[in-house]
Amino acid sequence: MARYTGPSCRLCRRENMELFLKGERCYTDKCAIKRRNYPPGQHGQGRPKVSNYGVQLREKQKVRRIYGILEKQFRSYFQEADRLKGVTGENLLSLLERRLDNVVYRLGFAASRTEARILVRHNHFTLNGKKANIPSIQLRAGDVVELKEKSRKIACINESLDAVVRRGIPQWLELEKDAYKGVVKTLPVREDITMPIQEQLIVELYSK
């Protein structure tokens, strides 16, 4: 399945929730969900009855779109989550949260996960003092993500940092804004992920 390149706001309307794909715009009244809270398309306002399979599929698609993951990679994450000890659905969300691009976004260096992925690929960050340009790197407790010196004057990064300071960051992370670095204090648990996700539906879908 190819990566989606169309309007991001259509995805939010399709999933009937804010996926925070457009950065700061998602926190304003310009958000598509706030303006048109129904699916895109000619018949979008007449939401049809959805089967159990359809509900499970939509939940999986929603999580994939939140984190910007293609189907093949998402299935690999699920298989790894299923092998780990604990609850499979919670393991899945923890693995997704611990991606380098997501941590960069959560720390406030980027306004969206898409922007964070681009910044990582363009070598703007180090991980524990070493070059890190692979968005899918899994972070562990104690890892330090730091913005390179040459990148600290980029306007969009500083604007994002100012915005996240006002909103706050997850408890499992720590941001040292003046030093342009963040630390993974602990691994994320289910209570740290506040998005309205029903991960058990994804487990049921892949268990068929």
UniProtKB/Swiss-Prot annotation:
SMART domains (UniProt xref): Ribosomal_S4, S4
Subunit structure: Part of the 30S ribosomal subunit. Contacts protein S5. The interaction surface between S4 and S5 is involved in control of translational fidelity.
Phylogenetic lineage: Bacteria, Pseudomonadati, Thermodesulfobacteriota, Desulfuromonadia, Geobacterales
Keyword Cytoplasm: no
Record-level Gene Ontology MF annotations: rRNA binding; structural constituent of ribosome
Name of protein: Small ribosomal subunit protein uS4
Species this chain originates from: Geobacter sulfurreducens (strain ATCC 51573 / DSM 12127 / PCA)
Signal sequence residues: none
Gene3D superfamilies assigned to the protein according to its UniProt record, in alphabetical order: Ribosomal Protein S4 Delta 41, Chain A, domain 1 (1.10.1050.10), RNA-binding S4 domain (3.10.290.10)
Domain S4 RNA-binding: 98-158
GO CC terms, sorted: small ribosomal subunit
Family matches, as Pfam families: Ribosomal_S4, S4
